[in-house]
C-alpha cells in the first residue's frame, strides 16, 4: 500500500466521493459533492527515506456551504492536526495531518468549492 492507495481507502471509508487529479463521473453523470486530490511534493535532502508532500483536496458541490463544512469536519476528525493518522505501508510508514482549508471562488452562485490541505510525511524503509 502506498500513499495514493492509503488516501483512497480513507476517503472511501469516510464516504467522500474522491478521485485523483480529475473527476470522471463513473456513469457519465456528474453528481455532487465530489472531491479531487492533487499532490505537491517538497524536495527533501535527507538520506533517511523521509519524504514530505501536501494533498490538495478540492471539494465541489451545488449544495450548501454546510455540506462542505460537514465534509471538512469528517476529514479533520480522521486526520487531526498535530496528531495525524499514522499507518504502515508496503514501503515504510505514513502520517497524514489536516493542514487547513479555505473557500475557492467559482464565479457561479450555486456552485461552491472548498480546498482542504493535508500534510503527508512518509518514511521509506526496508520492510
Segments and roles (model prediction):
Residues 1-19, 39-127:
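Charged, amphipathic alpha-helical segments and their flanking helix caps
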Amino acid at each position: 500500500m502506498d500513499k495514493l492507495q492509503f488516501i483512497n481507502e480513507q476517503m472511501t471509508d469516510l464516504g467522500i466521493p474522491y478521485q485523483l487529479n480529475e473527476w470522471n463521473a463513473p456513469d457519465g453523470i456528474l453528481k455532487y459533492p465530489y472531491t479531487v486530490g492533487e499532490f505537491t511534493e517538497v524536495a527533501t535532502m535527507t538520506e533517511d527515506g523521509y519524504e514530505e508532500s501536501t494533498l490538495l483536496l478540492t471539494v465541489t458541490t451545488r449544495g450548501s456551504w454546510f455540506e462542505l463544512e460537514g465534509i471538512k469536519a469528517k476529514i479533520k476528525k480522521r486526520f487531526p492536526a498535530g496528531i495525524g493518522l499514522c499507518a504502515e505501508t508496503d514501503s515504510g510508514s505514513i502520517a497524514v495531518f489536516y493542514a487547513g482549508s479555505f473557500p475557492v471562488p467559482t464565479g457561479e452562485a450555486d456552485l461552491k468549492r472548498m480546498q482542504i490541505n493535508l500534510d503527508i510525511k512518509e518514511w521509506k524503509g526496508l520492510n
